[in-house]
């Protein structure tokens, strides 16, 4: 792997998050950390494997606590949603489709990371719910429910 493409979860990643937090606060912003979305990593129809981001999630949670920054745990919410949907039904949220399904993307795709529109809306709604649950300034930034 190319070491310029990643950081170590419990060192440079945490340092980078703390830099973002400090810069946000220095500019009178209200930082909030949002854990990464889980990838589709099913071992069978209903059981997810250990996610690729689990160390980064733990590091982010530690950073949030240490720096007194609110956190939306999208990782846990998305894991629960994936387990509920199951391996087959969760494909509809990700770039997972057969050859010829899309004119602009005619080849087959089994991408368990990137989202289709429905997946983006589904997981973004979890972030909105998490921000609403934080209350205060975070909830105040949200629009009332709208139909997409």
Task: Report the location of each language-model feature.
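A short, charged, Gly/Pro-tolerant segment at domain boundaries
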Residues: 144-148
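Alpha-helical cap/lid subdomain in secreted, periplasmic
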Residues: 1-121, 125-143
């Amino acid at each position: 792997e190319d070491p310029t493409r990643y950081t170590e979860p419990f060192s440079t990643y945490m340092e980078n998050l703390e830099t973002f937090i400090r810069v946000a606060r220095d500019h009178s912003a209200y930082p909030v950390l949002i854990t990464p979305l889980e990838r589709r990593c099913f071992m069978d129809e209903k059981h997810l494997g250990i996610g690729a981001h689990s160390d980064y999630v733990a590091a982010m949670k530690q950073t949030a606590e240490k720096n007194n920054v609110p956190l939306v745990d999208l990782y846990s919410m998305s894991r629960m949603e994936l387990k509920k949907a199951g391996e087959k039904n969760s494909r509809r949220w990700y770039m997972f489709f057969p050859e010829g399904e899309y004119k602009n993307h005619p080849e087959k795709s089994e991408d368990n990371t990137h989202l289709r529109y429905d997946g983006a809306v589904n997981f973004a709604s979890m972030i909105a719910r998490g921000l609403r649950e934080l209350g205060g300034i975070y909830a105040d930034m949200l629009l009332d429910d709208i139909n997409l």
